[in-house]
Amino acid sequence: MTSRASKASKPLMIASTSFVLIWIFVAAFPFVWTLWGSFKVQGDFFSKADWRYALNGTRTAIETGGLFTGAGYEGAWVQQEFWRAALNTAIVVLFTVVISLTLGTLGGYALARSGHNYAFWLLMIALVFRAMPHITLVSGYLLPFFEWNLWGHLPTTIIVLVAINQPFTLWMLHSFFLNIPKDLDESAKVDGCTQFQAFRHVIIPVMWPGVITTGLFSFLLAYNDFAVTSMLLSKDNQTMVPAIAGF
């Protein structure tokens, strides 16, 4: 039976491995191709005459004397000062994630332990708010920001991104808190802890996987945002995504 099962599973294993390898190639090709083209001159990578120029670097060799060149990176990071956009992105993402996780952890724990029906409706309102198009929410901030001279600065963009990401963090962390037994809170209180001490010293250590997971999603949402950052930031304070779109 074992030999028959192994013989029957061998074609399936080959088919599964082949599918995974093909899928990896298809998914990785755009990134590898873009990375390869970044070391070529524009005439090679965007050549309409012969796509093989992007491979052999014919024009790159003529213009630079080599098959590869780092002129594109120098032009972007030094001449166009792309490092400013990278620094702005790091600042925006860091504060957005920290504030979102802090408020989401406190709010999610409170809603999970409240035991009242209004907790469900608050989460539903948050979900509706999260489902609204970002461009609709941002347009409501533009006029006040212009009147109060707040437009174009990083703190205002961080506030808006936190407001947009907060419903998501509430939902995620609330669901994680629901999976933690309330007996842990009660045991901590029996040992003399207050509600906040039980939350800090007992619940949070158990919640770290959920906090890290939610933080990763919040990081991706803030890092990849285009609508908010492109509309609320000036050219000098742009993050990486709108800066890349402007090249």
Task: Report the location of each language-model feature.
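A structural signal for multi-pass alpha-helical bundles of membrane permease subunits
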Residues: 4-8, 12-247
